[in-house]
From Swiss-Prot:
PANTHER family: GTPASE DER. GTP 1 binds at residues 10-17, 57-61, 120-123. It comes from Prochlorococcus marinus (strain MIT 9211). Associates with the 50S ribosomal subunit. InterPro entries: G_ENGA, GTP-bd, GTPase_Der, KH_dom-like, KH_dom-like_a/b, P-loop_NTPase, Small_GTP-bd. This is GTPase Der. Residues 4-169, 178-353 form the EngA-type G domain. Belongs to the TRAFAC class TrmE-Era-EngA-EngB-Septin-like GTPase superfamily. EngA (Der) GTPase family. Transmembrane segments: none annotated.
Amino acid sequence: MGRPIVAIIGRPNVGKSTLVNRLCGSREAIVDDQPGVTRDRTYQDAFWADREFKVVDTGGLVFDDESEFLPEIRQQAKLALSEASVALIVVDGQEGVTTADKEIASWLRHCECPTLVAVNKCESPEQGLAMAADFWSLGLGEPYPVSAIHGSGTGELLDQVILLLPSKESSEEEDEPIQLAIIGRPNVGKSSLLNSICGETRAIVSSIRGTTRDTIDTLLKREQQAWKLIDTAGIRRRRSVSYGPEYFGINRSLKAIERSDVCLLVIDALDGVTEQDQRLAGRIEQEGKACLVVVNKWDAVEKDTYTMPLMEKELRSKLYFLDWADMLFTSALTGQRVQLIFNLASLAVEQHRRRVSTSVVNEVLSEALTWRSPPTTRGGRQGRLYYGTQVSTQPPSFSLFVNEPKLFGDSYRRYIERQLREGLGFEGTPLKLFWRGKQQRAAQKDLARQKENLSK
């Protein structure tokens, strides 16, 4: 779908993720000295010679070991190859040809897409040619010496990649997808939920905490709408995380919240809302993101007619700052209600981008003032709310012009927000209210006059 894909394949610790970052001009792929840091397949955008394409990084392939994750990593690499236009096997020039390299090369010969050999860690151009020559023995064509760290040789490698990509006409860009980030603590079922949504094993699933170490982007289309689903590393308290792959993965997860259009906050139905869930909810609200709360593992809960409403009431009491978010009880294991996620997420995004006319805003405010007047101080000073207007979207933000902001306490401010929600909707998105006093209004008018004078 959309741009062509280049799959990066190789054994552990040959520098695949470093090369991905070099080819894409970013630092999104997690790089660490220990082998096996990358487990799932992760996508990044790349651009070269007036061509846009995607690079998919895969976990290190090992064929003589069936221990935890390794069969799943091979399956992820196989899925990456099935959608790729070009396969790029990365080898270590300093180590030379290994048995594992030969096994991977033999495996790639059954791949339908063309294959290139990138001989990494060739920091010296002269020695690099000699190192690369040994890899002709893999039988995959000319080996290209590169240094992922320094960037040498990557231009020539990208030139060859571009030659093998399908023509522009056959890979036209589609509309920008809605970015949906799947956020939650470790082991709440985020990757299982992603796989259930996609109908394929898109992310490795295990009962071991921290299986997903990086953010994983998946593109799919539903009812003519393109979506980018971002599965993230489970986020624990920072003091519980040592410096390394998990630390970087958590940072990527927090950045995924920033770049998302809507967040799915996944809660474990068996655990309920924990302190860390509350922190994540607060981060989503702080970033001003649309949100849907997904209560996963609903199949494992013993229930009767009253279980769901009672549990929702309990969960909402602990997630009170997300009281505007819809809550959906699902089971990634059985698929129960999983497909409803798209409907509710679409509604949340629509409301997040929605704009309301000033006249409609003030109709709602006028009715709110009729039902409950602004507070009065002990000295007899009463707050006055003159008018309001929407100033931005994503999230919907309103400026409320008053005589003096400090006269309006938290209770009355919450009341006005509730009235705006009841009168205008805005399900699934936070609202931002800015209370502007007389001095602020005067300063804004002066600034507007100055701009008008400068334009004359």
